């Protein structure tokens, strides 16, 4: 998780060095912060709904989240929320999106690239499809608001809430040590 975040940050830094488009602004705004929280909660609820009705997605989400979350302890979940939320949004929405264009093509390329990053194997395609939809929504929010804060906050919320729910559900399944 930490290594991936550093690699993504380095890619973003190198990209910014060579690309005159620059970085999408990140402006602290209560309204955009609340919009990011709302978007993050909406994405999380939509994911929960898809989890219930799409068996292939459920299987792939469980496999992916087991791989990522099982070795983590509760305090690590804070880092899981912050590191990918910041590094992935900086690269995909902060740097890539303005470089390609704050338009439909930019949204499509940014969202699809984000989805592909979340595919650990070809069998994980249902999870990649959902991650692509999420990437499109995050890119759209960045274009509409012109503020990187919205997708960053949304991404952090999705990661934090999803990981806490997963940990709670799987903690209850463990046998007691009595």
What does each model-found stretch correspond to?
Residues 53, 57, 66-178:
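Transmembrane helix-loop-helix hairpins at the membrane interface
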Residues 1-68, 72-84, 160-178:
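Specific transmembrane helices
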């Amino acid at each position: 998780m930490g290594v991936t975040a550093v690699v993504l940050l380095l890619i973003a830094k190198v990209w910014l060095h060579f690309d005159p488009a620059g970085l999408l602004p990140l402006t602290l705004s209560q309204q955009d912060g609340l919009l990011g929280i709302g978007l993050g909660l909406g994405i999380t609820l939509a994911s929960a709904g898809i989890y219930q009705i799409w068996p292939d997605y459920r299987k792939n989400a469980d496999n992916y989240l087991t791989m990522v979350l099982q070795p983590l302890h509760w305090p690590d979940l804070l880092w899981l929320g912050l590191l990918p939320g910041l590094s992935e949004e900086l690269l995909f929405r902060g740097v890539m999106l303005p470089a390609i264009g704050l338009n439909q093509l930019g949204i499509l390329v940014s969202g699809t690239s984000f989805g592909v990053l979340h595919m650990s194997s070809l069998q994980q395609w249902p999870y990649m499809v959902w991650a692509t939809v999420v990437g499109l929504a995050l890119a759209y929010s960045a274009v509409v608001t012109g503020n990187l804060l919205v997708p960053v906050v949304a991404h952090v919320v999705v990661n934090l809430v999803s990981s806490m729910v997963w940990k709670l559900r799987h903690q209850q399944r463990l046998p007691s040590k009595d």
